């Protein structure tokens, strides 16, 4: 089995967890590759990773079935965007207190990898949503694509907001 690793290099916990993760992967004979952007961060910490293990997102998307995001939910979202054009299975290890998208705790990594290897998991379909703000003068402000949900809020309490919902450019509902 092969897996791609998409780490958040800004998370200090990554560096203390890294050795344990690699030991688990090696014990389970899981071949791993690391996103190319991570090279500088690992080298600056004197963490030796064979240069052939660093791969581009494009290479990983085309050659691997599984991608493991390591960090927080933001890291998961970045990985989801990076691999959105590829047919990969994305899961993640969260390095903080709570993870909604990166749902694997560090203490559960070995068990979860066993489930992945034996294909005893349930896939959860997620989708990217696009949104924009249509201003009164007709101009549009396009917002970044998001995963699964869009939260609509008001700048001022008590100010009315009207929302037109379109699905695939077809008007669905006004709120």
Language-model regions, residue ranges each:
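ATP/NTP phosphate-donor binding region
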Residues: 1-66, 107-122, 133-144
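Short, solvent-exposed amphipathic alpha-helical segments in soluble enzyme
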Residues: 19-24, 84-85, 166-168
């Amino acid at each position: 089995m092969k897996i791609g690793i998409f780490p958040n290099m800004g998370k200090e916990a990554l560096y203390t967890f890294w050795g344990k993760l690699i030991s688990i992967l090696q014990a389970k004979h899981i071949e791993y590759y690391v996103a190319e952007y991570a090279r500088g961060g690992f080298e600056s910490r004197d963490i030796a990773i064979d240069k052939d293990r660093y791969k581009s997102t494009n290479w990983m998307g085309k050659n691997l079935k599984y991608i493991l995001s390591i960090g927080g939910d933001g890291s998961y979202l970045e990985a989801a965007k990076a691999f959105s054009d590829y047919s990969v299975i994305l899961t993640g290890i969260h390095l903080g207190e709570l993870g909604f998208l990166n749902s694997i705790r560090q203490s559960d990594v070995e068990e979860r990898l066993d489930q992945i290897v034996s294909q005893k998991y349930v896939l959860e379909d997620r989708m990217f949503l696009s949104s924009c703000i249509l201003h009164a003068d007709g101009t549009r402000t396009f917002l970044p694509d998001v995963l699964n949900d869009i939260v609509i809020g008001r700048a001022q309490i008590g100010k009315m907001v009207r929302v037109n919902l379109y699905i695939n450019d077809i008007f669905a509902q006004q709120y």
